[in-house]
């Protein structure tokens, strides 16, 4: 019983230290600055990746209407839902 109590005390101190480091450490990291466009490297062969910017027209609502078309198979064991395919709007 005493051995289990020691394990519990050690685990409590471990999690207390972990929670303290997770909550306090970011305060010492300092604020994150935003990069200026002039600071970003231009895309070329040696650096093919480039930061992307998001414009307001790029944000469009996604339609949640999903239509399903069913077609008849030439098999005697036709099962509902198995031979139905989406109309292409879902991408599946």
Swiss-Prot record:
Residue ranges of the region described as Disordered: 36-62
Superkingdom assignment: Bacteria
Pfam families reported for this sequence: YjbT (PF17089)
Keywords: Signal
Lineage of the organism: Bacteria, Pseudomonadati, Pseudomonadota, Gammaproteobacteria, Enterobacterales
Database matches in InterPro entries: YjbT
Signal sequence segment: 1-29
Name the record gives this protein: Uncharacterized protein YjbT
Family: Belongs to the YjbT family.
Residue ranges with Polar residues bias: 41-55
């Amino acid at each position: 019983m005493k051995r289990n109590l020691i394990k519990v005390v050690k685990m409590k101190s471990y999690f207390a230290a972990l929670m303290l480091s997770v909550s306090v450490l970011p305060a010492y990291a300092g604020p994150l600055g935003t990069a200026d466009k002039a600071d970003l490297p231009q895309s070329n062969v040696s650096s093919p990746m480039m930061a992307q910017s998001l414009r307001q027209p790029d944000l469009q609502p996604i339609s949640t209407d999903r239509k399903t078309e069913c077609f008849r198979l030439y098999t005697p064991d036709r099962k509902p839902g198995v031979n139905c395919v989406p109309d292409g709007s879902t991408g599946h």
